[in-house]
Design a protein with these regions (language model features):
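Short beta-strand/loop element within the Bergerat-fold HATPase_c
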Residues: 34-45
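A residue-level detector for a conserved hydrophobic packing site
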Residues: 16-17
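Short alpha-helical Gxxx[C/S/T] motif in the catalytic ATP-binding
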Residues: 85, 89
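Short conserved segment of the HATPase_c
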Residues: 58-71
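Conserved micro-motifs of the catalytic ATP-binding
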Residues: 4, 8-11
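Short helix-loop "hinge" at the ATP-lid/N-box region of the Bergerat-fold HATPase_c
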Residues: 27-28
């Protein structure tokens, strides 16, 4: 989903690109169904990126550790990553003055960044 008009981010392009790549890679790696990504413009000059993907109900996620380096959730998964992707998302989002949050129950990750 995209807004009907252009959204200009007042940010470092390479950092935003890395954030989106890491979110998508993580979603693809752990998804058990269709992935939905959206971009919305909010009031207060903010862009909101949301990625939603269904995960295997057997996957255990500790919300308190989700953005920690090397945290991989369910270590028994054969396609588990290194555990740095979401930590990098958090680091870069913080550097850009934004915010990242997770709704574990519905498996939605949200990144909010400043726009022009």
């Amino acid at each position: 989903d995209l807004p009907p008009h252009s959204v200009y981010l007042n940010s470092d392009y390479s950092m935003v690109e890395r954030i989106l790549q890491n979110l998508l890679t993580n979603a693809i790696r752990y998804s058990s169904g269709d992935i939905k990504m959206s971009l919305k413009q909010a009031r207060e000059n903010r862009a909101i990126f949301t990625i939603e993907n269904p995960i295997d109900s057997k996957t255990e996620i500790n919300p308190a550790r989700l953005f920690e380096r090397f945290y991989t959730g369910d270590a028994s998964r054969h396609n588990s990553g290194t555990g740095v992707g979401l930590a990098v998302v958090k680091l870069l989002t913080d550097k850009l003055g934004g915010n990242v949050s997770a709704e574990i129950k519905s498996n939605v990750l949200t990144v909010t960044l400043e726009i022009q």
